[in-house]
């Protein structure tokens, strides 16, 4: 987590530099962070999130949230990455303007709980109105409920080559997958690869 946090804190200036180098101008840049663990092991501490933050004008708010994150909890694998992905799809994306990019970046070194598990578990903290299974989550990405602007959406994943992550990489459009090693953290992720993937998607 320390490596991810350090990279997150320098993310905006590095991204802006990369955009400038490619003569790309982004008038409005909003970032939302969803930090997740395991609803079935961590209860109310399973998820921490921000609203969308105007990173150009309110970087301090973003940095404060990143500093507050800790690696506590999570239990053993798997974790609730699919729920975090669903929550990101349900976000308040900007819909005005001719040129938009709705980019979701997933950093994970864990496999995922199946969405069906929620139907047989009584977790009061589990988020409302989640997809009941992977097929419904796929429908969300396809624009049947969310992410309806096909030309705007992008999904960049740094996640293990296993279960749902592999299925997403294989079957979802506008998706790039850089495999990480399950259970070994994300220190091996090339930070410049992350920046390049985002800049090239704009």
Each language-model region and where it sits:
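Solvent-exposed loop/turn segments at secondary-structure junctions
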Residues: 36-41, 71-74, 109-114, 161-165
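Extracytoplasmic/secreted envelope proteins and their assembly/folding machinery
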Residues: 5-12, 33, 59, 63, ...
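Extracytoplasmic/secreted cell-surface and envelope-processing proteins
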Residues: 1, 41-45, 97, 112-121, ...
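C-terminal "exit" segments of structured domains
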Residues: 172-202
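Loop/turn elements at helix/coil->beta-strand transitions in domains of secreted/extracellular proteins
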Residues: 26-31, 97-103, 148-155
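VWA/integrin I-like adhesion module and closely mimicked acidic/polar interface patches used
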Residues: 110-172
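Von Willebrand factor
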Residues: 1-107, 112
């Amino acid at each position: 987590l320390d490596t991810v946090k350090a990279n997150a804190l320098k993310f905006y200036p590095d991204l802006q530099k990369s955009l400038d180098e490619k003569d790309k101008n982004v008038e409005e840049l909003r970032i939302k962070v969803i930090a997740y663990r395991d609803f079935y092991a961590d209860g109310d501490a399973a998820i921490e999130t921000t609203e969308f933050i105007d990173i150009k004008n309110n970087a301090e708010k973003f940095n404060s949230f990143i500093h507050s994150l800790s690696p506590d909890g999570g239990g053993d694998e798997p974790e609730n990455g699919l729920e975090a992905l669903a929550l990101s799809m349900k976000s308040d994306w900007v819909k005005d303007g001719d040129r938009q990019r709705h980019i979701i970046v997933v950093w994970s070194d864990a496999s995922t709980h199946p969405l069906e598990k929620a139907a047989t578990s009584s977790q009061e903290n589990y988020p409302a109105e989640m997809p009941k299974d992977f097929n419904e989550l796929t429908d969300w990405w396809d624009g049947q409920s969310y992410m309806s602007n096909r030309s705007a959406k992008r999904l960049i994943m740094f996640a293990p080559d296993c279960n749902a992550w592999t299925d997403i990489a294989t079957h979802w459009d506008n998706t790039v997958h850089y495999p990480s090693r399950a259970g070994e953290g994300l220190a091996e992720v090339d930070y410049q690869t992350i920046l390049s993937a985002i800049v090239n998607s704009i």
